[in-house]
Amino acid sequence: MRVLGIEGAKHALEAATANGVPTLDRFFGKGIAAAIKDRLPKYGRVRLIVAMNVLAHTDNINDFLPEVVGLMEADTVFVSSSHWLVALVQKFEFDTIYHEHLRYYTLKSLMQLFQRHRLGMVDAEITDFYGGSILGYAVKDANGQSERLLSILEQERQVDIIGSLKSMKQVLLNNKARLIGLLVELKRDGKRTVGIGAPMKASTLLNFYGVTSDLVDYLAEVNPLKVGTVVPGVRIPVVHEDVLLRDPPDYAIVLAWNMAGDIIPKYRSLGYSGKFILPVPKLEVIE
């Protein structure tokens, strides 16, 4: 298989190139199809186009999709992953809402968008990516749909999105009050609390909950691009996770809570014996 990447973000471009993936230094937008076609004599026909969590980051989706279609032949498959709105409201994933994510989709709305650009969704599945994502498979001018896709559409018809959003609001306000109450109590008792991880979603969560550096000492992170920064708004410093392991706190908030199943065993294996706090979907303290 011959692969060609399209990447306008400097660090991702450098990483792809370092790993031997030929990559164009530009974003996927108007005019990109022509630039790629210039290289097709070397790479061959476009058989597969993959856009994982890209649509939500695209400023003008109606410039993006015509370029996708312009590269496709009758047997080309366009595979995309998008955060599923149903999962967002049912799992209270409010912290996935931040400045880089411009839109969220149901399968129905994604199919309607694709249809405007001659893309037919023929299959779809729900994955655990980002707490719940639509992995869609589309081809040009297709009409047939898989049973799996139709089942997801039926599932969506059973969901009251507006009602779920209202319920989510109340749950989050309750979580906020409980978390702040817990952190204040721990501080009063002389306990130390930190955060594990500095994902982008942490900025939304910490600012909405009002968790500041008065209550949380720091966030422990392994990504060198984040170490040495602070969380906007609440001004909590980001340090390397070695700080946590050298001087373990009493409590650690798992900010990438959707990955708690991996994070908690990891820190236990590294010797951390304190307690974990999960802030979403419900406030939970894990011994």
Write out the residue ranges for each language-model feature.
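Short, glycine-/aromatic-enriched active-site segment of Class I SAM-dependent methyltransferases
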Residues: 78-103, 107-109
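Short amphipathic alpha-helix with an adjacent loop that forms part of the alpha/beta core around
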Residues: 32-44, 241-247
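A conserved beta-strand element that flanks and buttresses the S-adenosyl-L-methionine
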Residues: 44-50
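Class I SAM-dependent methyltransferase SAM/SAH-binding core
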Residues: 1-34, 214-229
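Conserved S-adenosyl-L-methionine
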Residues: 119-130
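Flexible, glycine-/basic-rich loop-and-beta segments that form/coincide
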Residues: 130-173
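A short glycine-rich, Lys/Arg-flanked "PGG" loop and its adjoining helix->strand segment in the class I
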Residues: 62-79, 268-269
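Conserved beta-strand signature within the Rossmann-like core of class I S-adenosyl-L-methionine
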Residues: 75-83, 275-285
